């Protein structure tokens, strides 16, 4: 008889949040070994909620064999702190209520989202739920990003007493867990630093992944790629793409000023250079306003792509950005790297030295990296990618990244690691 695992997931399919996609892959990939239940919010990543989910009730569903409890949350604006916090608190409160309905569980799995509350839900679940034999379930806390460190790095909340309480709560979640899993070597260092002079909680590191059966290199003549290029005016262009959350943690407001210097640029083989931003987030309006004000015809904004079209938008680029703001090293790990490697494209990275993905890019040799805030180095790297647009070196970089991914960072490899460490608890 399979053991039971409960997963707390603020976002889950069809929401396009990267953490939601990771947890969907995990939930569905673990079904050979576990009976999986997920507590998540109704689809709401964009801030809007479909009419069919607006009744204030719990929605019980099944998706690809995974049992879901979707809890009601209010709509929100990504630009409004108050409405975002209200949304997060609603999910936290409703998820606690549903916890009492899920029945016996052998394992509780949660990630570090929503900030602080993700870990607290795991602690709550371990306390309230029992196994079939009446014992407390094992609690696995997967830290995708550290808070309050991330909040502090971005200045999203500046009240020190609030941050002190938040740190205390998240350290408690780590202590109460039976296993902490981080997604980068630098995040392991942060865990050790958090507990300097204390007993460090049991922990391991497992990289995130990409589903190599859904995201893989395509021939540029593929219909889906041509369709996207035609739709957004990208035909015969040299495309430097940012794909993902256009939010607080990436210094995009600084990078757009560097990009402005390349307005109207061409490659040696005569193609116009275009900077494409694919996605949405709290900084999008500021970027679009800046681009409009400065007449930056070389910048194009494209909405989030459905999961079945993501392969085409990622393949449409010649080069991909992978960026984090200063202070994010050891705090968060940009999952977009795995998608870039998945489609065998070179990486234009802005990452701190010693961060997991910076180390991977340099170890593999699949891109150019500069430090956050070093805009001259960013400018030099952009220029290098433009000057070498017709060079075979770009394809070689992309292929090195893809080869490494296929051998080390596929969905099946990483999920087997999760299954193995959880089963041993």
Predicted segments — roles?
Residues 1-61, 262:
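N-terminal subdomain of nucleotide-sugar transferases
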Residues 270-272, 278-279, 284-309:
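Nucleotide-activated donor-binding/catalytic signature segment of Leloir-type glycosyltransferases, i.e.
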Residues 117, 124-128, 161-182:
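Membrane-proximal helix-turn-helix segments that form the acceptor-binding/catalytic region
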Residues 250, 299, 306-312, 320-341, ...:
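Nucleotide-sugar-dependent
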Residues 392-408:
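A short, well-ordered alpha-helix in the C-terminal region of glycosyltransferases
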Residues 42, 186, 206-209:
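Carbohydrate-associated surface elements
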Residues 54-57, 216-233:
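A short helix/loop element that forms part of the nucleotide-sugar donor recognition site in Leloir-type
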Residues 234-250, 256-259:
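Conserved donor-binding/catalytic core segment of Leloir-type glycosyltransferases
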């Amino acid at each position: 008889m399979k053991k039971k695992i409960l997963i707390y997931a603020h976002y889950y399919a069809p929401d396009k949040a990267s953490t939601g996609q990771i947890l969907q892959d995990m939930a569905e990939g673990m079904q050979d070994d576990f009976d999986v239940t997920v507590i998540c919010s109704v689809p709401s990543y964009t801030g809007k909620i479909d009419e069919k989910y607006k009744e204030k009730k719990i929605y019980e569903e099944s998706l690809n064999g995974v049992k879901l409890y979707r809890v009601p949350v209010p709509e929100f604006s990504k630009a409004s702190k108050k409405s975002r916090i209200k949304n997060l608190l609603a999910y936290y409160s409703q998820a606690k209520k549903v916890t009492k309905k899920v029945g016996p569980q052998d394992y509780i799995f949660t990630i570090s989202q929503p900030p602080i509350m993700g870990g607290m839900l795991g602690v709550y679940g371990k306390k309230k739920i029992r196994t079939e034999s009446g014992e407390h379930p094992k609690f696995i806390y997967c830290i995708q990003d550290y808070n309050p460190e991330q909040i502090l790095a971005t200045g999203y909340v500046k009240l020190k007493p609030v941050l002190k309480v938040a740190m205390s709560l998240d350290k408690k979640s780590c202590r109460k867990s039976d296993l902490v899993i981080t997604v980068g070597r630098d995040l392991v260092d942060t865990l050790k630093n958090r507990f300097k002079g204390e007993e460090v909680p049991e922990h391991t590191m497992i990289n995130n992944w990409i589903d190599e059966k859904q995201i893989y290199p395509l021939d540029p003549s593929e219909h889906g790629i041509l369709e996207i290029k035609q739709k957004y005016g990208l035909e015969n262009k040299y495309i430097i793409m940012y794909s993902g959350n256009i939010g607080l943690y990436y210094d995009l407001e600084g990078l757009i000023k560097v990009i402005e210097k390349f307005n109207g640029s061409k490659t040696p083989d005569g193609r116009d250079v275009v900077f494409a931003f694919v996605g949405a987030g709290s900084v999008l309006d500021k970027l679009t306003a800046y681009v409009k004000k400065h007449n930056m015809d070389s910048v194009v904004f494209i909405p989030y792509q459905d999961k079945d079209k993501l392969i085409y938008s990622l393949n449409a680029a010649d080069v991909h950005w992978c960026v984090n703001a200063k202070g994010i090293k050891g705090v968060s790990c940009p999952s977009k790297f795995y998608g870039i490697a998945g489609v065998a494209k070179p990486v234009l990275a802005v990452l701190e030295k010693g961060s997991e993905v910076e180390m991977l890019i340099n170890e593999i040799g699949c891109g150019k990296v500069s430090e956050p805030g070093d805009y001259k180095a960013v400018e030099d790297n952009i220029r290098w990618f433009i000057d070498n647009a017709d060079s075979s070196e770009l394809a070689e970089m992309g292929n090195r990244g893809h080869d490494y991914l296929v051998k080390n960072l596929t969905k099946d490899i990483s999920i087997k690691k999760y299954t193995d460490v959880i089963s041993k608890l």
